[in-house]
Regions:
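Non-heme di-metal
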Residues: 1-132
């Protein structure tokens, strides 16, 4: 349980870092952020009802997909933007560690259809946020 509390604190750090960096770059957050947060919380709560192994499997798969998403951003960021790169690399490292911790603590690999639904949902979220 300790690792989940620590991971939650790191996720909060990530949100703060991203908000700060967006402000520095005169960027803006997606208007959908509250919806994404509420949806993610709800989905996490649903998976939590299936027991610890499934819940940890959900954490593992979520973090794996976040790592892939961060890698895509890292490939697009100008090498001159060292501050953003550093933030994303730190986030990537944290997310990868969260996935590994979920496995080490008994996470059960999710079934392929569940992984595909998660991937599709993430794609809808990221593409919608990018355009609105």
């Amino acid at each position: 349980k300790e690792h989940l509390i620590e991971a939650g604190e790191e996720e909060t750090d990530h949100l703060v870092w991203c908000k700060k960096r967006l402000d520095e770059l005169d960027g803006k957050e997606s208007i959908f952020n509250p919806l994404w947060y509420a949806g993610s919380f709800t989905i996490g709560a649903i998976f939590g009802r299936y027991g610890e192994k499934v819940s940890l499997g959900f954490v593992e798969e979520t973090e794996k997909q976040v790592v892939i998403h961060l890698d895509k951003h890292l490939n697009k960021i100008s090498l001159k933007d060292k501050e953003t790169i550093e933030i994303l690399q730190t986030m990537r490292s944290d997310e990868d560690a969260h996935a590994q911790q979920a496995v080490e603590n008994g996470g059960e690999e999710l079934e392929i259809p569940t992984k595909k639904i998660m991937k599709y949902t993430a794609k809808v979220m990221t593409s919608t946020s990018a355009h609105i």
